[in-house]
């Protein structure tokens, strides 16, 4: 059962990383004049998809890493930071560019944290390449003269 939770957690954390790139594209398209549709896509991607995935990454961490409280806390930090990042979205009535600039900066931090979580899941699932040298019974290749 743990392996199922690891897979779900790994896929969701990886999806967060990919969706943040997509979200950056949407906001850049909006700034470049693509219209309100790009801004709506940016908002939907961030709130519904990314923030929902952040919550699920936290919840699946309980099954993926049972009783690894520091690691579960790290996934909770991803969710909390994502929530703070959403609240830093500029509102049309009041704007403080210096404060709301943290919205974009924290998106990058969320992406890095999600990548760290995905990497841990990849490692625990055994999806990384084997280290050079092979098994203990095989000798490493000899250099050519």
Where are these regions (language model features)?
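Polytopic transmembrane helical bundles with strong interfacial aromatic enrichment
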Residues: 1-145
């Amino acid at each position: 059962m743990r392996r199922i939770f690891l897979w779900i957690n790994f896929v969701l954390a990886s999806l967060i990383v990919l969706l943040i790139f997509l979200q950056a594209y949407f906001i850049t398209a909006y700034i470049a004049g693509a219209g309100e549709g790009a801004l709506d896509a940016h908002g939907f991607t961030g709130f519904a998809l990314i923030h929902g995935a952040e919550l699920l990454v936290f919840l699946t961490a309980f099954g993926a890493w049972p009783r690894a409280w520091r690691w579960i806390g790290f996934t909770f930090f991803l969710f909390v930071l994502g929530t703070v990042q959403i609240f830093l979205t500029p509102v049309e009535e009041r704007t403080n560019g210096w404060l709301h600039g943290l919205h974009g900066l924290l998106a990058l931090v969320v992406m890095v944290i999600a990548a760290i979580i995905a990497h841990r899941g990849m490692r625990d699932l055994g999806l990384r390449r084997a280290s050079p040298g092979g098994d203990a019974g095989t000798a490493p290749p000899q250099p050519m003269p």
